[in-house]
Regions:
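Conserved catalytic cysteine-centered active-site region
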Residues: 1, 56, 61-63, 67, ...
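Catalytic phosphate/nucleotide-handling subdomain of diverse soluble enzymes
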Residues: 355-375, 383-403
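Short acidic capping loops at alpha-helix termini that bridge into adjacent secondary structure
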Residues: 102-107, 135-137, 307, 333-334, ...
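Hydrophobic pocket-lining "lid/loop/helix" segments that shape and contact the acyl-thioester
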Residues: 3-33, 41-50, 54-56, 60-67, ...
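Short glycine-rich or small-residue beta-strand-to-loop segments that form or flank ligand, phosphate
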Residues: 107-114, 140, 311-312
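Residues that mark the start of a beta-strand
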Residues: 8-10, 105, 165-167, 371
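Short beta-strand segments
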Residues: 12, 112, 142, 169-174, ...
Length: 417
């Protein structure tokens, strides 16, 4: 038997959620007032939160859910469900308008949300809301962290290999309500500062007819999981503190865990995307470091700017961005989509790489033939990469995305934010 030829997976279009209610927009000062008004945080915790916010890279127009913006805040299950439904349905509605795809044509749904796992699932919520066909294939990923968006894309890709002539709808979001922490453990307070409302809906297709209208096609997916190492596994952990308050704890090993996962991921990716001369340099260095003491021979950092025109690096925080820029030797221009997304929208978890791609499109930077690298990392510890090839030049005048009405205001100087 002849091996089955792999089907191209096309990215028809995508949409990122932007809250329409101005009451959900939250400045850093107002965020601190909301936190203080709960009466659950000690003065030293409030001081710590202020310091984190000041150097977080987050701006003054990020979004929080309505239930948290209220005084007193209400973090019940019903409000968590309302938050997620608003984000998910809002993103899908916009995507449907952009693509003109009929709901009856959707054959696969993959959703991911780490902290909110309702019954019925988010994928079932979508089926119910849009009254989709009884034979739609649905998958709901939970607890997989900020890199789960690209895991969802990979799952959809694999399903599209065995289900011909199909559309796959991928939804990536996070629930801020469920992730809120009301205790005083410093390792668990950081998440309160960084994470904000956001979500993305992505339409993938294996239909040959969609090759003419799709924006991109998927060239590579590389997934790395370091969960076998205890320090990596425990670096991001949802748990209860000594007083029984639940939150997500970030350990002191988080940066080293991210570094290990990143190194493993880019080592695999490099073989698929780098020019031959760069591959030879990288391989020679790797062999030399294995033969001799690694401290003697410095690791060679491949020039990924030879492989990609655009970089969409997960908005894990300013410190993470600084380290990624240093490791990958990227210019400020290449880091701009990630830094501006963190500044304007905060850390929207698994959907952040889509806000970054939307930024590139709104700036008119994406041309036919360009290569885009999305890279995200999160709990597990996992690092995942997706490589996209632009099938057309994106005209920003014709685009409608969260940046459209304000793209002229960016970039801004985030040095002091």
């Amino acid at each position: 038997m002849k091996p089955t030829r792999k089907k191209h997976v096309y990215l028809v279009d995508f949409a990122c959620y932007k809250p329409h209610n101005p009451a959900c927009m939250c400045t850093k000062e107002h965020f601190l007032k909301l936190i203080k008004s709960t009466g659950k945080f000690r003065d030293e915790s409030l001081d710590f939160l202020r310091k984190i916010l000041e150097r977080s890279g987050i701006g003054e127009k990020t979004y929080l859910p309505e239930c948290i913006m209220k005084t007193p805040s209400n973090t019940c299950l019903a409000e968590a469900r309302n938050e997620t439904e608003s984000v998910v349905i809002g993103a899908i509605d916009e995507l449907m308008l952009k693509t003109k795809v009929k709901k009856e044509e959707i054959g696969i749904i993959v959703t991911n949300c780490s902290l909110f796992n309702s019954i019925p699932s988010l994928s079932s919520m979508i089926v119910n809301h849009y009254k989709l066909s009884h034979n739609v294939l649905t998958y709901n990923l939970s607890g997989m962290g900020c890199s789960a968006g690209l895991i969802s894309v990979d799952l959809a890709r694999q399903l599209l290999q065995v289900h011909p002539n199909s559309y796959a709808l991928v939804i990536s979001t996070e629930n801020i309500n469920s992730g809120s922490y009301f205790g005083n453990n410093r390792s668990m307070l950081v998440s309160n500062c960084l994470f904000r409302v956001g979500g993305a809906a992505i339409l993938l297709s294996n239909r040959i007819s969609d090759s003419l209208r799709s924006k991109y096609y998927l060239k590579h997916i590389v997934r790395t999981h370091k969960g076998s190492q205890d320090n990596c596994y425990n670096s991001i952990l949802q748990k209860e503190d000594d007083n029984g308050d639940t939150g997500v704890a970030l350990s002191k090993d988080i940066m080293s865990s991210a570094g290990e996962a990143l190194n493993a991921n880019i080592s695999t990716l490099a073989k698929n995307v780098l020019p031959l001369i760069e591959q030879l340099k990288f391989l020679t260095n790797l062999v030399a470091r294995n033969l001799f003491k690694k401290k003697v021979i410095k690791a060679y950092a491949p020039n990924f700017m030879l492989a990609f025109e655009h970089f969409c690096i997960h908005t894990g925080g300013k410190a993470v961005q600084d380290q990624m820029q240093k490791v990958l030797k990227l210019s400020d221009w290449h880091m701009e989509p990630s830094r501006m997304t963190l500044y304007r929208y905060g850390n929207t978890s698994s959907s952040s790489v889509w806000y970054e791609l939307a930024y590139c499109e709104a700036k008119g930077r994406v041309k036919k033939g360009h290569r885009i690298w999305q890279i995200a990392f999160g709990s597990g510890f996992k690092c995942n990469s997706a490589v996209w090839y632009a099938l057309q030049t994106i005209d920003p005048v014709k685009e409608k995305n969260p940046w459209t009405d304000e793209i002229h205001e960016f970039p801004v100087n985030v040095t002091n934010h």
